[in-house]
Amino acid sequence: MPVQTIASKRVAHSRRGAVAVEFAITAPIFFLFLLAAFEFGWLNVVRHTADNAAYEAARTVMVPGASAAEATAKATSVLNVIGARGAKINITPSNITNSTTEVTVAIDIPMSSNGLITPRFTGKTTLHSESTLKTERAN
């Protein structure tokens, strides 16, 4: 059995509690990065869903006989999959006729009301998605 010297006992004794102090310093920083990663991951989910909603709404309204209300309903349906709140959907032109050559669907989603954990990381960011398609009724 090895014999401990007085110097080695002092070193072992002076390190007591060091792990707890190091954990207390590093854990909040680690969890802050972890929460930020979740929040920015969610921001990407919302952004991609908004892109998809704008595209799907434009596809819905590009066919003859479709209306802006149908495009709004389609975009809302896609955004409801993730529970997006406060989205503003704008269809241009608002009155779609047989002479309409292209349609644009724009969606704005405020991240302040759509944060996963806390809106502190995204602040007043507003995600903007837009899709423009030629209509099938154009000559």
Language model features by range: what are they?
Residues 2-5, 59-139:
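Short, conserved structural patches
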